[in-house]
């Protein structure tokens, strides 16, 4: 590859995309700087010179956010970037998934792809720039990568598809799709949608693929110009004689073990065969490398037989038909003190989801590279080791947990009521209690049940299903509701979530080069049938959201005040609002438009806080009559509190009908008197009169007496 700087450009969605090579990070195997609008991402690819002694391909993809990219300095004491944000982790996964299938089987050299986001233009996706940069860095390097790949985001506005929509266009779009693939086929899909029909989602995917083909042609030109010759790498292979010997010893028993229907019994049967074979070679004092190869051969025997049974004999490991869903069981309201809970079980996969409602002040604050500053709906996914009968240290969420949580969030967000209709922050936590495949989709079903149990007025209930594929040559079988073994040994994990009306989320990962339109279409239609079946089951448990919230959920009052009065409610240094909170124990959130949200478990305290705020923002009008308490006495008159935060002066001359020599002769501090507003001066000071009311009362009494005498 030439070490001179070279620049290549293409138009992408009306904005220029530029690739620079030969100037930066020249010690990496491959490096490019991708500029898309004002977005800039440095993508590098590096590989170890020797293969690693592992039984998998050690690929790592990093998407590194730098806050300088948006002109921010990190918060806190350290003032530097810490652990990756959730968005960065999701972007890393997004790039990893279409790249991983395009390395040869048996390639064991460690590969690291690093994307550093250096400048961000919000209308030009840094994730898409990083995906193209990752593919290109690998393609121009000497690493044996069988790409290139490319990705595109697709939106739909007023029925028209849009490539790489701007921030403004994304707000109007009912589809948020990321699609990636080679020039021949799609190999990754990630989407959120507002209950969009399957046919429309398929059209959006194919629309994105047309743009992908153009970007791949652009990359091929660059590879032709500056690409290095691919290095010769020895792929991991098992010894042919050992392969034959192990197969003769284990194949027959392994085939029988695979057809045991129950998961744990099947695993025990397979492990028994493995144990017998391993012990045989240990008795012959085989070295670690030989034992590693034996394990590899045994794994291949299982994989080949499972795939043969599914594609040729149409038999699944647990005996189900291709489109058959495992037995379903659901329950709601199983945790008394939570705001809502839902238990969803599908075969040996089980998720318990809990819904917690909070005030709008409980929103998650986001401090990243995006324009979004907060979110009021969250879904978190936990996968403890006991769910698969294993032991391992309990640590924080990993990439997988964050990815599954985000998928559930994307699937459910389109049906969450607006802030205006339901002024709550909603947090869902899904605890996976048992796992045998499709746990992310079980968490979506459990979360729907939990929100309905909590009384969240969902626009429609959502269910999810994971589809699988086993493809050998031109023959393939699509599987509904895949279990763990089918996911692990199959070619596709295609998760589809949605309502009865349409799709709300898609996620597709594949282990082969790509999928045709026909397979995608068939998988989507088969998923729809399964999803509706699951929805009908869920609705048989709870038909609609509860009409009342849990007694332990916060009650929220919404009121509107004049925006000019917000400062009065808050007070100097927050003194006034803190006083209300201290007095009532409520949470108060005030929007810039004057909308006020008051929340607490105690409705009585909510009402009290509302009354205090109403008094603070209340406008005094001339002619109004108040019953107020005397707060202060001066020589010239008495100050009377009309309502919280508002006083007025009754001048000594307005205290009584007769002349008053001393204020204390008429009123004392703490007395409650009735007064009338007679004037509000230019400085906003309120002048009151007791005398006017006394005179009016005197006149009424005189009129009554006169009428009485006339009647006599």
UniProtKB/Swiss-Prot annotation:
Lineage: Bacteria, Bacillati, Bacillota, Bacilli, Bacillales
Protein name as it appears in the record: Polyribonucleotide nucleotidyltransferase
Catalysed reactions listed for this entry: RNA(n+1) + phosphate = RNA(n) + a ribonucleoside 5'-diphosphate
UniProt key word Ribonucleoprotein: no
Family, similarity comment: Belongs to the polyribonucleotide nucleotidyltransferase family.
PROSITE patterns tied to this protein: KH_TYPE_1, S1
Cofactor(s) the protein needs: Mg(2+)
Localisation: Cytoplasm
Gene: pnp
CDD domains found in the cross-reference section: KH-I_PNPase (cd02393), RNase_PH_PNPase_1 (cd11363), RNase_PH_PNPase_2 (cd11364), S1_PNPase (cd04472)
Job description of the protein: Involved in mRNA degradation. Catalyzes the phosphorolysis of single-stranded polyribonucleotides processively in the 3'- to 5'-direction.
GO aspect biological process, one term: RNA processing
Location of the S1 motif domain: 623-691
Sorted UniProt keywords: Cytoplasm, Magnesium, Metal-binding, Nucleotidyltransferase, RNA-binding, Transferase
SMART domains attached to this UniProt entry: KH (SM00322), S1 (SM00316)
